[in-house]
Structure formats: C-alpha cells, structure tokens
C-alpha cells in the first residue's frame, strides 16, 4: 500500500482560549507552517489559528 502524503495537524487559536481545529495538510506541497483566520467560538470572533503538532 502507498504511504499517505498527508499529515494530521492541529490549528490552535492565538487568542489564548485553548480552542483548536484538526485538519490534514499535504507535507510535500506545503512544508511551511499553516496560518489561517477562523472563528473562535469562545471569544466569538475571527482570530488567527497557527499550526501545532498533535500530541
């Protein structure tokens, strides 16, 4: 079987609430860390989410 080219990552809120999203990314086409603006329901605003490792 072929090895999957996608890694599981955790996108953690920069607002300091501890809220996070999980997703996958193709490690070959995007080797740099992801940074996306998404909605944080704990502060009820759109904030930046940065990539961290899943423990």
Swiss-Prot record:
Keywords: Ribonucleoprotein, Ribosomal protein. GO terms for biological process: translation. Residues 1-11 have a biased composition (Basic and acidic residues). GO terms for cellular component: cytosolic large ribosomal subunit. Residues 1-27 are annotated as: Disordered. InterPro entries: Ribosomal_bL33 (IPR001705), Ribosomal_bL33_CS (IPR018264), Ribosomal_bL33_sf (IPR038584), Ribosomal_zn-bd (IPR011332). PANTHER family: 54S RIBOSOMAL PROTEIN L39, MITOCHONDRIAL, LARGE RIBOSOMAL SUBUNIT PROTEIN BL33M. This is Large ribosomal subunit protein bL33. It comes from Herminiimonas arsenicoxydans. The gene is rpmG.
């Amino acid at each position: 079987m072929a090895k999957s080219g996608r890694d599981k990552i955790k996108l953690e809120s920069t607002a300091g609430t501890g809220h996070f999203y999980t997703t996958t990314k193709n490690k070959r086409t995007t080797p740099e860390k992801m940074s996306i603006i998404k909605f944080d329901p704990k502060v009820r605003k759109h904030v930046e989410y940065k990539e961290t490792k899943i423990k």
